[in-house]
Amino acid sequence: MRISKPHLRITSIQCYVCLLLNTHFLTEAGIRVFILGCISAGIPKTEANWEDVRKDLQKIENLIQSLHMDATLYTESDVHPRCKVTAMNCFLLELEVISHESRDGDIEETVKNLILLANSSLSSNGNITESGCKVCEELEEKNITEFLESFKHIVQMFINPP
């Protein structure tokens, strides 16, 4: 599977370390560059991931309009901030239903990419356990339009945390 977002490509830090060890690492400036490089490599870039998730979600919405799907999906319409990871996992599971029922290659590819991006962003939050949140099957079933609107709202919660 190919991720279509260029900022998610992993750079090989080993090459930089080897280069620094063989040339400038013995100077004070080389040590500073090495330390700053190590620090910047550890900074998560989840904000960009959620923006890309939002863009893929918009693309899915546009593609679905041409298919006229009438599926109903478990939808969390009033997400509490302390349950946003649980709600996002439910949305991602339901998104697979859209992918399966659409039988459209563009939707399937975009859904796979969106799920990959969202999961990589969620993994940066660590293993968060949220108690008191509804499980997916307890959520109200709504049409695709309402599902996508609620999905966009929760993605926005990850982009701009309360």
UniProtKB/Swiss-Prot annotation:
Glycans are attached at residues 119, 127, 143. InterPro entries: 4_helix_cytokine-like_core, IL-15, IL-15/IL-21_fam, IL-15_mml. The keyword Disulfide bond applies. Residues 30-48 form a propeptide. GO terms for molecular function: cytokine activity; cytokine receptor binding. It holds the Pfam family IL15. Keywords: Cytokine, Disulfide bond, Glycoprotein, Secreted, Signal. Disulfide bonds join 83-133, 90-136. Gene3D superfamilies: Interleukin-15/Interleukin-21 (1.20.1250.70). GO terms for biological process: immune response; interleukin-15-mediated signaling pathway; neutrophil activation; positive regulation of cytokine production; positive regulation of immune response; positive regulation of peptidyl-tyrosine phosphorylation; positive regulation of phagocytosis; positive regulation of T cell proliferation. GO terms for cellular component: extracellular space. Residues 1-29 form the signal peptide. It is found in: Secreted. Cytokine that plays a major role in the development of inflammatory and protective immune responses to microbial invaders and parasites by modulating immune cells of both the innate and adaptive immune systems. Stimulates the proliferation of natural killer cells, T-cells and B-cells and promotes the secretion of several cytokines. In monocytes, induces the production of IL8 and monocyte chemotactic protein 1/CCL2, two chemokines that attract neutrophils and monocytes respectively to sites of infection. Belongs to the IL-15/IL-21 family. This is Interleukin-15. It comes from Marmota monax (Woodchuck).
